[in-house]
Amino acid sequence: MDVKRVKQILSSSNRIDVTYEGVPVWIESCDEQSGVAQVYDVSNPGESVHVNVTALEEK
């Protein structure tokens, strides 16, 4: 995935399924400069991680 698509997903009112290393995640935010997104595991929303947007996959 790229930063442009992450931004589109963030601004969308639709639910768009995204995974990180095969795990379903919600995208919380994206830093366009660094290409890093803050994501939460759908099954464990209490913990977030920062990942490179290229590691995210749209399902």
Curated annotation (Swiss-Prot):
State any GO CC term. endospore-forming forespore
Q: What is its main location?
A: other
Q: Does the keyword Nucleotidyltransferase apply?
A: no
The protein in question is named Small, acid-soluble spore protein H
Membrane-crossing ranges are none
Q: Which GO terms describe its biological process?
A: asexual sporulation; sporulation resulting in formation of a cellular spore
What's the family? Belongs to the SspH family.
Induction text? Expressed only in the forespore compartment of sporulating cells.
Question: Domain of life here?
Answer: Bacteria
Q: Does the keyword ATP-binding apply?
A: no
| Intracellular or extracellular location(s) | Spore core
Keywords assigned by UniProt? Sporulation
InterPro entries in the record? SASP_SspH (IPR012610)
Q: Which HAMAP family match?
A: SspH (MF_00667)
